[in-house]
Amino acid sequence: MNLTVSDILEFLENVAPSSLAEKNDPIGLQVGSKKAPVKGILLTVDPSISACKFAIDQGLNLIVSHHPLFYNPMQSLTPDAYPGNVAYYAVKEGLNLIAWHTPLDKVSWGVSAALAERLGLSPESPILSETSLGEGNGLGVLVKFSKSVKLGELAKEVAKKVDSWVMMVGDENCEVDSLGICGGSCSFLMEHLKKLSVKTLLTSDVKYHTAKQAEIEGFNFLIVDHGAAESLVLPKLKEKLNQFLSKRGFQIPVVIFTEKSPYKIIQEV
């Protein structure tokens, strides 16, 4: 009996239910067939051409990415422009592409919990809880420090442990006793955290005007590379997937693929 793409979709549904997905989040099988036999699985943040070529080189025919390839209807499917070029290449090479996005953001063991774990911190609760969808599920995590730490020192620790550049909004000498963590683009959680008397958020992709507002209001941001933060969930997903495969009696390779950040730090002020 062959392992199929449908079996992997069932696995994902069990470990990070689709009911956790944000409205209009295009999760699931985006390219390929549910009936296709699975020879090997690639886990990655983004379904890129590089990821596809690596999968082919490794003999893997299923890619499970965090980010979807398609968010909006495509206007063309050609080898010349993204994202159509990825779909074109995947179909040509017989690859199957699954995206499993916000369920991995919200599940209790997911993206933000993995980021906290990398920092050696224990989450107390989600920032935005969705207990109706399971205990501990929700967006982001809250952590408290037994002893306060200066924001600047915390930024240096984050840079070292996450292996990412870090931008900081706030006074580096500010004492931090609690922290919101949300892998991905979560600056919108600032207002919610302020209501919880938490004045620092570790996240990605903070816009200028949001940063300016935070600076004026005394709220702190630690901003890290989006891909670096979200890639930390992949080893946890791999572990769960290997357990699933072992119980089913399959010996299928599961490989993590990471790409360099598109951002390059040229000069520090």
Task: Spell out what each predicted region is.
Residues M1-V269:
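Active-site catalytic microenvironments in core metabolic enzymes, especially phosphate/sugar-handling
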